[in-house]
Regions:
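Structural signature of tandem alpha-helical TPR/SEL1-like repeats
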Residues: 25-35, 61-72, 98-109, 137-147
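Alpha-helical segment of the N-proximal tetratricopeptide repeat
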Residues: 9-28, 32, 36-39, 43, ...
Length: 159
């Protein structure tokens, strides 16, 4: 109980410090902050898994950081986090050195994100189904469905 409270307080403080420039430039402060994010993520806190997963994916040092970031994003997406599911879809569609782009897997993650209320995921699904992709045939009905869902979630195209 006390350790969980300490973890929550440390995470809260680290999230507040994240918005200041100085702690991010200090190696010891940054290491402490990452420790707080990792601790809360390990305790199963979905927002911490999503936040730290994004940090590791985009700012992590080395190949292991990227893989850990994807693992945390996967856990967060399975816990219902729409941003994490959206980012996993983006990563699946982009592919990397070890795997080909996978449009069907991207569609699965974006469907989860859209169900969680992520408007851009619904819009990207509409585009994906409108154009089709390797392994995912074009489907105008699905495209229209997700375009309507994106609008209902608040997506407004530029222009």
């Amino acid at each position: 109980m006390l350790l969980a409270l300490r973890a929550r307080l440390g995470y809260w403080l680290a999230r507040r410090l994240f918005h200041w420039r100085w702690p991010l430039q200090q190696p010891r402060a940054w290491a402490w902050m990452q420790g707080q994010y990792a601790r809360m993520a390990a305790l199963g806190h979905v927002p911490a898994q999503s936040f730290y997963g994004h940090i590791l994916l985009f700012r992590g040092q080395g190949f292991g950081a990227r893989e850990e970031g994807l693992r945390l994003l996967r856990l967060a997406a399975q816990g219902g986090d729409g941003k994490a599911a959206y980012q996993l879809g983006v990563q699946c569609l982009a592919g990397d050195a070890r795997q080909q782009p996978d449009a069907a897997e991207a569609a699965r993650w974006w469907t989860r994100a859209a169900e969680a209320g992520h408007p851009l995921a619904a819009q990207r699904l509409a585009q994906l189904y409108r154009q089709g992709a390797p392994g995912l045939p074009a489907d105008p009905q699905q495209a229209e469905h997700f375009a309507r869902q994106a609008e209902s979630l608040g997506f407004r195209p530029k222009g």
